[in-house]
Amino acid sequence: MSNPSLVRSNWTRKEVEALFALPFNDLLFEAQTIHRQFFNANEVQVSTLCSIKTGACPEDCAYCPQSARYDTGLEREKLMAVEKVLEEAKAAKDSGATRFCMGAAWRSPKKKDMPYVTAMVKGVKEMGLEACMTLGMIDKDQATELAEAGLDYYNHNLDTSPEYYGDIITTRTYQDRLDTLDNVRHAGMKVCCGGIMGMGEDESDRVGLLLQLANMPQHPESVPINMLVAVEGTPLEQQEALDPFDFIRTIAVARILMPQSHVRLSAGREDMNDQTQALAFHAGANSIFYGEKLLTTANPESNKDMQLFKRLGINPEKREEHKTEQEQVEQINQQVAEAALDKVFYNAAS
């Protein structure tokens, strides 16, 4: 079903700018057409995010309520006990999640913390869930240790374009982020990497971010596209909200540039109406965080997400290795039927 020739790592700025400049309907049509060549258009991956260590981060990311530099009313919490994390993971699985993501507000994990986080990874994997972590910058040895524990994904976002980055963060360089991503790849883990929209950047910065992601030697397997949640006490608390159509355009371009990646509709969904989320799915978003909280910010209630899925005819994506033989047969039959349908549409238009 997929077309490998569509997967490229040599995009030019001019090409990406041309995609952003397409009429809205044309852009979404192209994104949806490509999406259907690589994914079931009516399935969305469901992940759950758990904050395993909250607050007191020494970094100065202008959007983040967990920075120790800002007075956001967030209380510092110690690293969560392994048993508690695994309880959260079990609850996530029982609610339908297939991936469990764990986030810690660190610049980078300390040596004394590694036995605890690797124990969390092993416990999550034993439940049959995919495991993802975001712990800040990690070196080669830490990446190897996490990989050996069974970690599937490591999240480390680029946040924005190289040009706008210095306006948002000064305590960690863009190259620091790229180095961590290289360490993750070298250890054999999958990469989760995206950015945040609506931080005051312009379209050229959204072009620049997606260009960085799409021209990596291997595309991130997961690309979270976040909408800024302007938290009181952070430098961006008064930031004007991004036009939803600009947000949808970014998702659509991400889908076209990285056709094999899961594009995650991530932070900011609490402030999106159902119509905006439906457009995001049509533009190629096929992953969400499920649960009432994302680290420290609100997220739509779980039953609200399932109600929206039902209205749109969307089903939660299942992990391939956990599909039954009958489900695999049904999937193959569906793909054959879709291929035949595509051929009919093609002939009708010719």
From Swiss-Prot:
Top-tier EC class: transferase
Keyword Protein biosynthesis: no
One of the protein's GO biological processes: biotin biosynthetic process
Metabolic or biological pathway: Cofactor biosynthesis; biotin biosynthesis; biotin from 7,8-diaminononanoate: step 2/2
EC nos: 2.8.1.6
Domain Radical SAM core: 42-269
Cofactor(s) needed by this chain: [4Fe-4S] cluster; [2Fe-2S] cluster
Keywords: 2Fe-2S, 4Fe-4S, Biotin biosynthesis, Iron, Iron-sulfur, Metal-binding, S-adenosyl-L-methionine, Transferase
Pfam families (alphabetical): BATS, Radical_SAM
Record note on cofactor: Binds 1 [4Fe-4S] cluster. The cluster is coordinated with 3 cysteines and an exchangeable S-adenosyl-L-methionine. Binds 1 [2Fe-2S] cluster. The cluster is coordinated with 3 cysteines and 1 arginine.
Catalytic activity as recorded in UniProt: (4R,5S)-dethiobiotin + (sulfur carrier)-SH + 2 reduced [2Fe-2S]-[ferredoxin] + 2 S-adenosyl-L-methionine = (sulfur carrier)-H + biotin + 2 5'-deoxyadenosine + 2 L-methionine + 2 oxidized [2Fe-2S]-[ferredoxin]
Entry GO MF terms: 2 iron, 2 sulfur cluster binding; 4 iron, 4 sulfur cluster binding; biotin synthase activity; iron ion binding
Binding positions for [2Fe-2S] cluster per the UniProt entry: 101, 132, 192, 264
Binding site for [4Fe-4S] cluster: 57, 61, 64
Keyword Ribonucleoprotein attached: no
SUPFAM superfamilies listed in its UniProt record: Radical SAM enzymes
InterPro entries on file: Aldolase_TIM, BATS_dom, Biotin_synth/BioAB, Biotin_synthase, Elp3/MiaA/NifB-like_rSAM, rSAM
Family the entry assigns: Belongs to the radical SAM superfamily. Biotin synthase family.
PANTHER family referenced in this protein's UniProt entry, alphabetically: BIOTIN SYNTHASE (PTHR22976), BIOTIN SYNTHASE, MITOCHONDRIAL (PTHR22976:SF2)
Subunit architecture: Homodimer.
Function recorded in the entry: Catalyzes the conversion of dethiobiotin (DTB) to biotin by the insertion of a sulfur atom into dethiobiotin via a radical-based mechanism.
Annotated protein name in UniProt: Biotin synthase
Species annotation: Saccharophagus degradans (strain 2-40 / ATCC 43961 / DSM 17024)
Highest classification ranks of the organism: Bacteria, Pseudomonadati, Pseudomonadota, Gammaproteobacteria, Cellvibrionales
Gene: bioB
